[in-house]
Amino acid sequence: MLCIKKPSVASAFNELIPKILKDGEVVETEFEERTKEIRNTIIEITNPKLKKVPEKYPLGEKAVEEYTKNLLYGSKNVFSYDYHQRLFEYPYADEKINQIDYIIEKLNQQKNSRRAVAITWNPKIDIEVSRDERGSVPCLQLVQFLIRNGKLYQTVIFRSNDALLAFVSNAIGLITLGEYIAKKVGVGYGTYTHHAISMHIYVDRDFDYIKKYFPECLKYLW
C-alpha cells in the first residue's frame, strides 16, 4: 500500500513514479506484459486548482486537454465504453441515466448526503467484453462526492491505473469534473482523493519513456 499527500497532481506524479519503479512488485499482466505494481495506492491532492501538467509527463499538455474534453463532452470515437458515456449516459436497459445530473440534484437537496455516487462498470456489457482477450473495460470504477464544511470533496476509485501514462490525465480531468459539480452546487472545491487498486507502470512497453524522464530509476528495473 502507498499513500501520497501532495498539493498538486504534478508533485504527486513526481513522487509516484520513482516509488513504483523502486518498490513496486513485478507482475506479468494477463496479456503477458511486465509491470511494476503497488496495490492500493491512495493519493490526496490538497490544492487541486494547481493543475499544471508535470514536465516529466510523457504525453504532455495536449493529451490532458483532450482527455478532459472527452470526459466532459464526449468523444466521436466508438469504443466499448467511454467515461463520458458511463457518467452522463449510463446504459441501462433502454434508458440512459445521467449520473452527474443526479449527483448535482442530490447535493443541492441534501448537502450532507453520502449518496452522491456515480459508477462506470456495467456488468451486462463489461463481463462479456472482459471475456475477449483484448476487450477494453473501464479502469475508473466509481466517483463519489461529499460536501463537508462548505466544500466539495471528491474520491475516485480505479480498478487499474497506468501511473506513467494515465494518472495525470485521469486526475486533472476528474478534478475538472469535480470543479464543474462544485460550481453547480454552489460550494468551493476541497480535495481530490485518487485510489488505484492496481497502480502500475509497464516497464518494457514504456522503457523509452522511463529512460528519458526517469533515468535515475533504470537501476530498479532489473
From Swiss-Prot:
Pfam families, sorted: Thymidylat_synt (PF00303)
Q: Does this UniProt record's set of keywords contain Amino-acid biosynthesis? A: no
Protein role = May catalyze the biosynthesis of dTMP using an unknown cosubstrate.
What this protein is called in its record is Putative thymidylate synthase
Q: Which EC class is the enzyme in?
A: transferase
- Primary location class: cytoplasm
List GO BP terms, alphabetically.
dTMP biosynthetic process; dTTP biosynthetic process; methylation
Task: Enumerate the transmembrane spans.
Answer: none
Which keywords accompany this UniProt record? Cytoplasm, Methyltransferase, Nucleotide biosynthesis, Transferase
Assembly and interaction partners: Monomer.
User: Where in the cell is the protein located?
Assistant: Cytoplasm
Q: Which residues form the active site?
A: C139
- Which pathway is this protein assigned to? Pyrimidine metabolism; dTTP biosynthesis
Which cellular components does GO assign to this protein?
cytosol
The UniProt entry, under InterPro entries, shows: Thymidate_synth/dCMP_Mease, Thymidate_synth/dCMP_Mease_dom, Thymidate_synth/dCMP_Mease_sf, Thymidylate_synthase_arc, Thymidylate_synthase_AS
Lineage, opening ranks: Archaea, Methanobacteriati, Methanobacteriota, Methanomada group, Methanococci
Q: Which domain of life is it from?
A: Archaea
| Family according to the record | Belongs to the thymidylate synthase family. Archaeal-type ThyA subfamily.
What are the EC numbers? 2.1.1.-
**What one GO molecular function would you report for this record?**
thymidylate synthase activity
